[in-house]
């Protein structure tokens, strides 16, 4: 590749990245400060752990939608992602999981890599559905086992206050499933207990959870006081920049997601979100009653938004690549170093995306 300011695991290097057979062979160059030159930035590819759709398609539509969704998000620098389900009848969830499980075994040319599934519901509080359809129910281990047999479920969002969910958190976290607290009316104490039981993150922090109050800290308070990881939607609509800064100061490995819907990468109009019809307008996606319903955010815009509120480019990149990879326990993605997958994005000095590579493949994203 041409000479760039390359963000490596050890800092900025002015030089070139050499790759072969999809993996990084070497990074040749010298340490630098990007402020001293006008070269482009070469960053690790973005890893989005919360994707419902894009390009007019929704994950819940099944196999026919996946290639469109992954081709849409790669155009904006997402090189790998988790396909995220909606709360739905169990047979519908099973059908989608089976299709995702099969799709994970391949990566069509020109697409982002699907790393697995984020099961967002149905094990959530019906009083905090947000944009989720009303199919929430208490988790049953037999049902979860059926789901796990169909696809690599990496993350499950769960409301810890529901009876029996503490046992599920213990059982599944011990098997490597990341259990996230979300869509919950739980108390501060219930949030802390869930973390002690093995929960490891929070789903779209601040949104669809009991808020912080100085006498009732709620789930938000549990996250700010105790979490190492949490996901946050940095579209500047879901969370005020001031609240974003509070979370960034409090949660060491806060990482950012899009929570993107079918409307991502598309013009204003009506789109599907699970069984709902949502409307994209004024930069957001909403239900008919005005409730925010996922986002239209893309990861390159997430980077620009983080920089806009004051983060250095290196830290913004870390929260879009390295921290999501670390959270999933993935060492071969999310960082540019020898032996890692050659997943990277190039941006000009205005942070406009100019090139994307997935597993060594140059993506023709402008004509996708």
What are these regions (language model features)?
Residues 4-6, 326, 336-368:
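C-terminal cap of metal-dependent C-N hydrolases
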Residues 219-229, 249-258, 263-340, 344-347:
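His/Asp/Glu-enriched, well-ordered alpha-helical/loop segment
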Residues 148-268:
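Active-site core of metal-dependent hydrolases
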Residues 52, 67-96, 111-125, 151-161, ...:
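Divalent metal-dependent hydrolysis catalytic cores, especially in the metallo-beta-lactamase
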Residues 46, 53-59, 82-92, 208-225:
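Active-site loop-to-helix "anion-binding N-cap" substructures in soluble metabolic enzymes
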Residues 1-31, 357:
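N-terminal metal-binding scaffold of metallo-dependent hydrolase/deaminase domains
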Residues 71-82, 126-150, 193-205, 216-229, ...:
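Active-site gating loops and adjacent loop-to-helix segments of metal-dependent hydrolytic enzymes
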